Amino acid sequence: MLEITEIREIISHFGLSAEAITDFHDTSHNDDDKRWNYVLDNKYVLKINSVGAMWEERLQEIKRLIARYRSVGVYCPDLIPTLNRAMSCSRNIGGKEYTCFVEEFAIYPIIDDEFEHDRKEVIEHLGLLASKYTNVDLSETKSMWSIIDLAPLDIDIDEKQENTNMLTDALRRHGYDLLAQQVDSLNSTLREKIKEVFADLPRCVYQGDLNTTNELYKDGRFMGLIDFNMSGTDVNVNVFLNETNWFPEDEEFDALSVREIISKQDAEQAEKMSVILRHYTLNDLEQYVIPYYKRIVNIFQYPDVCSMIKWLNNDSRREKCACLIKALTEKPL
């Protein structure tokens, strides 16, 4: 952890000074991906990242994206430029190079874990953003939801394909070889349909990581977002569907029939999609491709695949889980 004197020297390049470190968060992934966050006087956050985790061009991109979010009424703490108008400066710390940048300290708090927030209130801005900025200043970096195109953390295959492989491996371990083949076949068919029109689908740049640890609230109302590390370009309908997907928790899985689970999944998603589509009109190509994206999202989101693998490992839930997977696989498009 840096001393306050070292921090003062770094932030002087941004025209700032600080009395004290008021908080510190280490969100590092590993030794090659360090991410240190120093809250200074509850006014600024100095972020020190390994060079590979953040770089100048990426920060310039994020600053432009923050401005777009603000323009549609979503508050986001802004990045503060250096005195020479760059977004970062470099420092050698312990023999390693780091990118240093400064963000405003958020004026609203992150939501309390116990608060039941209205998801529709959070996702409505997606339609506003897409209606105003589709195909504008697209980033070379892809969002974490991206399929076919690879996001920064993807290696060789996109995350949804990795999730598919995890699920089919689990099915085979438990003797459901035919069902695993059906899942693989469906996934391949869906992807081929998407690839036919993929290049022409409308896209936008998104924050890419909507969850309660990144959402800011005031008096129980959604106000804004922090953390644009996962931001990137994605197909609009893919983002809409990922952010509106519903899947049962353990209690709901036990209480509802397979038919009821699928019915609720469709109803919950349709209700949330209608909020986004108040502000965004799907074109013919998007309407054509939505069923294929929807099926991938409904089956292969990472937390949901983890749930299904857990249920397959449970003697009392295994057969019902296999029935759910089969029903989702065989459901008409």
State each model region's role.
Residues 16-39:
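ATP-binding glycine-rich phosphate-binding loop
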